[in-house]
Regions:
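Extracytoplasmic "Venus flytrap"
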Residues: 1-8, 12, 21-35, 46, ...
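Structural recognition of the beta-strand scaffold that forms the well-ordered cores
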Residues: 2, 21-23, 50-52, 73-77, ...
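Short, solvent-exposed amphipathic alpha-helices that sit
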Residues: 3-18, 98-102, 126-146, 160, ...
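Flexible loop/hinge segments that line or gate small-molecule binding clefts
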Residues: 19, 57-97, 108, 115, ...
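Short beta-strand->loop
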Residues: 24, 92-93, 117-127, 152-155
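Hydrophobic alpha-helical segments within soluble ligand-binding/sensing domains
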Residues: 34, 90-116, 130, 160-162, ...
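Hydrophobic alpha-helical
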Residues: 42-44, 48-67, 135, 150-214
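Hinge/cleft segment of the Venus flytrap/periplasmic-binding protein
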Residues: 127, 138-140, 145, 230-281
Length: 281
């Protein structure tokens, strides 16, 4: 879970009197540890699972086991490719809308003409593939003078993504802008721009919840935010209904928000990013 997601889930759990055990790997890309956490929870007879999976495909068998065992399960942020049903629900970000926001923003800052690179396209996460497809569809239809000259697959760590971005920004014939489709690729691209003194020269649009100061200072043009607090709140609300034998909506889709220097201090952004923590001892 993201911190915002945890906060939203904790608030609803407090209101509903649910006891929550929060567990996560020490590294964001530690797939085997996350799988192990879920397997152990099932072995111990947990009453429900809320999961933000590192990847989609490796979790299908484990989540099917949970469903077959009658354990209510809510998946947050990633579509596993298993249809929602009585014991399985999804709370997702509208990734197509995120790609559209990125496309229109890059078109605006480039004046409708230029070259861009897309980094962070992961074959393991459908979210980044959807963002990339939506981004390129909008550019092709509405901004034909903006050309995608480089596409790079996503890597799991920030240092790896930084190395990818450094290959792009170190070129003399570098692109006008980079669109980074994940948190790791956004951070890696930003660090590469700092390292090669290309801040401002190459525009960066990313997907990240925490890089606020670089947006405020102009180091990053903009980031697309997911409403992680609301995702956590909705996920725990669905879990509560499932545990009480009700039939909640099987899938919820939440809209992203484009964060720029112009709206970073707005009430809408503050509401999305402010964490209200409740601890049920």
């Amino acid at each position: 879970m993201w911190e915002g997601e945890h906060a939203g889930a904790a608030l609803v759990a407090h209101e509903k009197g649910l006891r929550v055990y929060y567990q996560a790997p020490t590294r964001e890309d530690d797939l085997s540890s996350q799988l192990g956490i879920i397997e152990r929870a099932l072995d111990r007879g947990c009453n429900g699972i809320i999961l933000s999976p590192v990847e989609a495909l490796p979790f299908r068998t484990t989540i099917r086991r949970a469903i077959d065992s009658g354990v209510p399960t809510v998946i947050v942020g990633t579509d596993l490719g298993i249809p929602p049903g009585k014991k399985l629900a999804y709370v997702l970000n509208n990734e197509e809308a995120g790609g559209e926001l990125a496309a229109r923003r890059v078109a605006r800052i480039l004046g409708g003409k230029g070259t861009i690179a897309i980094v962070g396209i992961s074959s393991q996460l459908t979210s980044t593939a959807t963002r990339a497809r939506s981004l390129e569809t909008v550019l092709a239809k509405e901004f034909p003078d903006i050309h995608v000259t480089d596409r790079r697959l996503g890597l799991p760590t920030v240092p790896q993504e930084q190395q990818v971005a450094e290959e792009l920004v170190s070129k003399d014939d570098h692109v006008n802008a980079i669109v980074a489709l994940s948190e790791a690729s956004t951070r890696g691209a930003y660090y590469a721009l700092v390292e090669f003194n290309r801040i401002g020269e190459i525009k960066l649009i990313g997907f990240d919840q925490d890089l606020l100061e670089p947006v405020r200072s102009g180091g990053i043009d903009s980031v697309i935010l997911q409403n992680t607090y609301e995702m956590g709140r909705r996920a725990m609300g669905i879990m509560d209904e499932q545990l009480r034998g009700k039939s909640p909506a099987p899938q919820v889709s939440l809209e992203p928000l484009l964060l720029t220097r112009d709206n970073i201090d707005s009430s809408q952004v503050r509401q999305m990013l402010t964490l209200v923590w409740w601890y049920d001892q």
